[in-house]
Amino acid sequence: MKPLLVIFNPRSIPEFYKAIEKINGISKLWIKYFPQDEAYNKARLFFLQSDYTHFMILPDDLIVTQADVDAIVNYDESYDSISGLCNNTGRDDTNIDTNISAFLPPDPPRTATYEGYRWFKIAQFESLLSKVENSDAIIPVLHQGFALSRLSRRLIEQVRFRTDAGCCVDSCLSLDLMKFRVGFTQYVDIRIRMKHLKIPRSELLVGKEKAIMLFEN
């Protein structure tokens, strides 16, 4: 397996930079300050023109550890889409909901409401973890809001990223819709929990800083 960690970086978040400095043993592609549609398409094209086998998505408002990255990398290659989970920042209290839903996003995604997703609660997964064996901690889901994710090359080849203007997390919502339609199942390991930061949209530097791609081998 040869994974590429793709870091979507439209902001400048010190806590994220401090965390990512500690991540080693994996190639990194930084997509900095591009509009969302350009960012995902440029990353996809770079990946498809390379010999990397897996596309790993990391947004810059998610704090991950080396253990998180290693765990996601080391899953069996039979998983076309697998991720951890994180807290959801859609409420003032960011420690109630997860980023996981058992329901598909609406189409188009911009018509979604927060309540409409019926997010799993953090407490639900904590309770489940206390009762299941490790082998039962990996569950199929219809939507997860971009915790650290690993996507196979065949998935990236078949599923294009698309955006739906007006939706704050449109690329992940649209990607979930397309994965489902093409026939891919996505899985979440509920043992791997990451910290999702609540960052105001005013912190976006798209259009304010020069858009660049940086590769670190």
Question: What is the meaning of each model-derived region?
Answer:
Residues 34-40, 166-167:
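A short, glycine-/small-residue-rich helix N-cap motif at loop->alpha-helix starts
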Residues 65-162:
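Conserved catalytic core of nucleotide-sugar-dependent glycosyltransferases
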Residues 41-54:
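Active-site nucleotide-sugar/metal-binding loop of Leloir-type enzymes
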